[in-house]
Regions:
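Hydrophobic anchor at the beta1->P-loop junction of P-loop NTPases
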Residues: 8
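P-loop (Walker A) phosphate-binding loop of NTP-binding proteins
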Residues: 11
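ATP-binding Walker
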Residues: 14
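Walker A/P-loop
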Residues: 17
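Conserved substrate/cofactor phosphate-moiety recognition/catalytic segment
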Residues: 21, 25-69
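Glycine-rich phosphate-binding loop used to anchor ATP phosphates in small-molecule kinases
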Residues: 59-113
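Conserved phosphate-donor/acceptor-positioning beta-strand/loop module used by diverse small-molecule
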Residues: 106-128
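Small-molecule kinase domains that catalyze NTP-dependent phosphoryl transfer to phosphate-bearing small molecules
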Residues: 126, 130-176, 191-201
Length: 205
């Protein structure tokens, strides 16, 4: 199986990072979660369960770009890579995040395989309150989490694998992803391109 950049997309509490860890038990992979970049800043300013100002998001994006530039030159060629993000349809900041990962996959000469995780609100509320999320400086306030995603839809890249994991374990989801990767290993993954057609106004919380 050729090396792949797996892009896990979902709302807070949908199980992106937990699924990524389960994937690492099946395939040799390196996780580059959104919190890897965000917590460089969030660990200093402590904005858990709070709105993040736009200017701070821009500084986080600058940190991210520098880390990706390092990764481009020094990535482990024998490993798959797993990225995670909450990408909102119509959000220009999230468009930039997505485009940066697409561009990185091209520079690393890896196919990009997007997986969108869907989860009902009842399970999101339950999952978002976990102790593990608190330790990782993630959103843990269920009311804030639901308000943050209210009226928003996930961005679904062309060719994405969509999984409703409301009643699935992370291990089951990881197995589904690997099975799909094996089906597509002979160059059948849909080529993912940079997007430039989203709205200009910002909708990110």
């Amino acid at each position: 199986m050729g090396k792949t950049l797996i892009y896990l997309i979902g709302f807070p509490g949908s199980g992106k990072f937990t699924t990524a860890k389960e994937l690492c038990k099946i395939i040799g992979a390196v996780i580059a979660s959104n919190n890897l970049f965000n917590n460089i800043i969030f660990d200093i300013v402590k904005l858990q369960n709070a709105e993040v100002p736009d200017d701070l998001w821009e500084k986080i994006f600058a940190v991210r770009e520098n880390v990706l530039a390092i990764l481009e030159k020094h990535y482990v060629k024998s490993k798959h890579y797993i990225f995670t993000n909450e990408l909102i349809e119509g959000d220009p900041y999230d468009q930039r995040l997505y485009n940066s990962v697409v561009n990185l996959s091209k520079k690393m000469d890896m196919e990009i395989f997007s997986v969108v995780l869907h989860c009902n609100n009842e399970k999101l509320v339950r999952r978002v309150q976990s102790e593990e999320r608190y330790q990782e400086n993630k959103i843990t306030d269920p009311d804030f989490a639901i308000k943050k995603i209210e009226g928003k839809r996930l961005f679904i890249p062309e060719g994405s694998l969509e999984i409703d994991n409301s009643n699935l374990s992370a291990k089951e989801v990881a197995k589904k992803i690997v099975e799909e990767m094996k089906k597509e290993k002979n160059g059948k993954l849909i080529k993912t391109s940079v997007t430039n057609h989203l709205k200009t106004e910002r909708t990110r919380g």
